[in-house]
């Protein structure tokens, strides 16, 4: 099992999840974060930290697309280990 970042993160990027991840498995794109599925240890501490409710366990239904997105982009986006400010317009999304 792994956790998956879903569409609710797009344009939000609050990054509270990054601060609590014990294995630094988050990767940052321009508009969202993703979780590297092979690095995630399934601890679940990130899920309740996300104010956008964008993080879900991959055991939930209909997450195949987002699991693929996370796996693909985690290979190329830079690793993020410290929280940054959310975009100024994050609350609009």
Curated annotation (Swiss-Prot):
UniProt GO MF annotations: 3 iron, 4 sulfur cluster binding; 4 iron, 4 sulfur cluster binding; electron transfer activity; metal ion binding
Cofactor(s) essential for the protein: [4Fe-4S] cluster; [3Fe-4S] cluster
Domain 4Fe-4S ferredoxin-type: 2-30, 31-60
InterPro entries: 4Fe4S_Fe-S-bd, 4Fe4S_Fe_S_CS, 7Fe_ferredoxin, Fd_C, FdxA, RnfB_subfamily
Binding site for [3Fe-4S] cluster: 9, 17, 50
One Pfam family it belongs to: DUF3470
Name by which UniProt lists this protein: Ferredoxin-1
Organism annotation: Afipia felis (Cat scratch disease bacillus)
Underlying gene: fdxA
